[in-house]
Each structure stands twice: as structure tokens, then as C-alpha cells.
Amino acid sequence: MSEATNQLKITQVRSTIGARWKQRESLRTLGLRRIRHTVVRDDNAQTRGLIAVVRHLVEVEPAQNGTGGKAQ
């Protein structure tokens, strides 16, 4: 693959207690399970839409070299 895809590092920083069902499901779809959990996802329209729904619960930053800073 010659094209490098942009990726985002997404970290859940707030709890889902009191959050609406759609917000909880959006976090699950992103792969976030708990506070301080970080995932790396491709930067595309679908991911951006999910982030928009939960923007107050997460922090988003560009991923460095496609890694989330954690060994997997």
C-alpha cells in the first residue's frame, strides 16, 4: 500500500454515567470501554461522525506513526 492513511488517537476521558444510549453505543463502536482507554482509528468520515457524537467524552489527537503509544 503506497498511500499512508491518516490515523487518530482517541482517548475516553469522561464516564458514560448519565450519557444517552446513542453516546454509549458510539463509544463502543469506536472500541472504547473505560476511562483512559485509548484506541487508534483511521481518520475518515465515519470515525469523525462517531467522535462528533461523543466529543465531550473523548480527547482526539493525531496518531504518531500509526501507534497509540501502547504496545499491543
From Swiss-Prot:
This is Large ribosomal subunit protein uL30. The keyword Ribosomal protein applies. Belongs to the universal ribosomal protein uL30 family. GO terms for molecular function: structural constituent of ribosome. It comes from Mycobacterium marinum (strain ATCC BAA-535 / M). GO terms for cellular component: cytosolic large ribosomal subunit. InterPro entries: Ribo_uL30_ferredoxin-like_sf (IPR036919), Ribosomal_uL30_bac-type (IPR005996), Ribosomal_uL30_CS (IPR018038), Ribosomal_uL30_ferredoxin-like (IPR016082). Keywords: Ribonucleoprotein, Ribosomal protein. The keyword Ribosomal protein applies. The lineage of its organism: Bacteria, Bacillati, Actinomycetota, Actinomycetes, Mycobacteriales. GO terms for biological process: translation. The gene is rpmD. Part of the 50S ribosomal subunit.
